[in-house]
């Protein structure tokens, strides 16, 4: 809300408006003077969006009569929490149940901590006062690709250095390959399969050295370096030792009910196992609340979608093709390209495809992976279909409005069912 999902999407949208005005308005018959970037206003709007959302949450807390204490919370014992405010004042809270939901923070390189000036995390990258001339991004995952895209659109030279041989490695391999193609068209430079060996701040220049698998080295110089190699649970100040909880690789161990080893203490979100996603944390929060109310809730972790808010967007749910191969499961693939989609042509957003994985015997949809315009919204169709164990044929036989991006899902399901998409 403050330094993650919402501010990054605000900047992604603003930067997309900017590049469209600069490069695509003329094709739509809109003649305007050359647009000029006002980064100060862009950052200001982002902050206003964040404030609006924060104020909305504060209103909901008040409406539901939830008391809020601002400060650093830590355990005194399993039924006592101490909150230390910024002015050093301490407040003691007595409680029957505790839910730990403290989130995560960016992980630095072991040999180069964040200086928050030139070697920055996503937090500082959302608050830059100047447009980088050359932004070097370490890490080709979701955060690196999203923020790298923002500054590439605004005119920065952007270079991505990734240790693995593919982008967004946790998603289906086809998505990473397609994202590489489209972001190269944006002008982003990539060094895949490179391990960063040194990173130094030399005043107004950062110098990075990286080594490929064949031991050849490269040296890159930029004015900012965004380190986006992952995040780690934020548990440092909780005083977990006071209640006998030990972390494992930084995470708080929980059982299938999200309960810790201490019977009245639960943990959710980024501090526990699983993907570090806001909507996963939300599902877990609802799960624990309903459980404490005596209900019998359920979270299907396989069907928690993942999204990359580049443009085109990338969205995924269910199994990847790589996972199905590893399981030895027989499957079939249905794919449909955006360039064959009337709605995509009308919007001039023809990069991308929909990929559906279905069981070879039963036709049940096992995974859906989309790269293209509106993918973040479209993936809900995959979640719904898989939640009710629909087959590819089930979706293919449903009427989809024309012209829409969702028709690509229908066509991909037709391709998976009997290799008979209508428009390719």
Task: Specify the residue positions occupied by each region the protein language model found.
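Flexible, glycine-rich terminal cap/loop adjacent to redox cofactors
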Residues: 6, 10-17, 309-320, 325-424
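FAD-site-proximal beta/loop scaffold in flavoenzymes
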Residues: 115-132, 219-293, 381, 396
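Glycine-rich Rossmann-fold phosphate-binding loop(s) that bind the pyrophosphate
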Residues: 138-141, 270
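Short hydrophobic core segments
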Residues: 73, 93-103, 137-138, 158, ...
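Gly/Ala-rich phosphate-binding loop of Rossmann-like dinucleotide-binding domains
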Residues: 148, 152-153
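N-terminal Rossmann-fold NAD(P) dinucleotide-binding loop
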Residues: 144-145
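Short, acidic, Ser/Thr-enriched surface-loop or helix-capping motifs
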Residues: 70, 212, 255-257, 359-360
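Glycine-rich flavin
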Residues: 1-131, 159, 164-168, 174-175, ...
């Amino acid at each position: 809300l403050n330094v993650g999902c919402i501010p990054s999407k605000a900047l992604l949208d603003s930067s997309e408006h900017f590049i469209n005005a600069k490069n695509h308005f003329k094709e739509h018959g809109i003649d305007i003077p050359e647009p000029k970037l006002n980064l100060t206003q862009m950052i200001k709007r982002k902050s206003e969006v964040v404030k609006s959302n924060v104020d909305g949450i504060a209103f909901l807390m008040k409406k539901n009569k939830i008391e809020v204490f601002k400060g650093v919370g830590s355990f005194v014992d399993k039924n006592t929490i101490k909150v230390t405010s910024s002015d050093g004042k301490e407040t003691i809270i007595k409680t029957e149940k505790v839910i730990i939901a403290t989130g995560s923070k960016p992980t630095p390189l072991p040999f180069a901590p964040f200086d928050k000036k030139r070697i920055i995390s996503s937090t500082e990258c959302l608050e830059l006062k100047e447009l980088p001339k050359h932004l070097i991004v370490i890490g080709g995952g979701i955060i690196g690709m999203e923020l790298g895209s923002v500054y590439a659109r605004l005119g920065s030279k952007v270079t991505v250095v990734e240790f693995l041989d593919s982008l967004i490695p946790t998603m289906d391999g086809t998505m990473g390959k397609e994202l590489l193609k489209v972001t190269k068209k944006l002008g982003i430079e990539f060094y895949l399969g490179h391990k960063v060996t040194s990173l130094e701040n030399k005043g107004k220049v950062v110098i990075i050295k990286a080594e490929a698998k064949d031991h050849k080295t490269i040296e890159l110089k930029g004015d900012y370096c965004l380190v986006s190699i992952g995040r780690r649970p934020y548990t440092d100040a909780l005083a977990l030792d006071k209640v006998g909880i030990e972390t494992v690789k930084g995470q708080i161990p929980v059982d299938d009910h999200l309960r810790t080893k201490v019977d009245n203490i639960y943990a959710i979100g980024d501090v526990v196992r699983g993907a570090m996603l806001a909507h996963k944390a939300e599902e877990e929060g609802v799960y624990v609340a309903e459980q404490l109310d005596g209900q019998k809730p359920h979270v299907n972790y396989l069907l928690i979608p993942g999204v990359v808010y580049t443009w085109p967007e990338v969205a995924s749910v269910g199994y990847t093709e790589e996972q199905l191969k590893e399981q030895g499961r027989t499957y079939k693939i249905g794919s449909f390209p955006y360039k064959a989609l009337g709605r995509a042509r009308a919007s001039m957003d023809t990069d991308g495809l929909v990929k559906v994985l279905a069981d070879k015997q039963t036709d049940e949809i096992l995974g859906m992976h989309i790269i293209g315009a509106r993918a973040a919204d479209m993936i809900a169709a995959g979640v719904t279909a898989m939640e009710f164990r629909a087959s590819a044929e089930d979706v293919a036989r449903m009427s989809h409005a024309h012209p829409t991006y969702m028709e690509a899902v229908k066509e991909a399901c037709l391709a998976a069912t009997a290799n008979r998409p209508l428009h390719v």
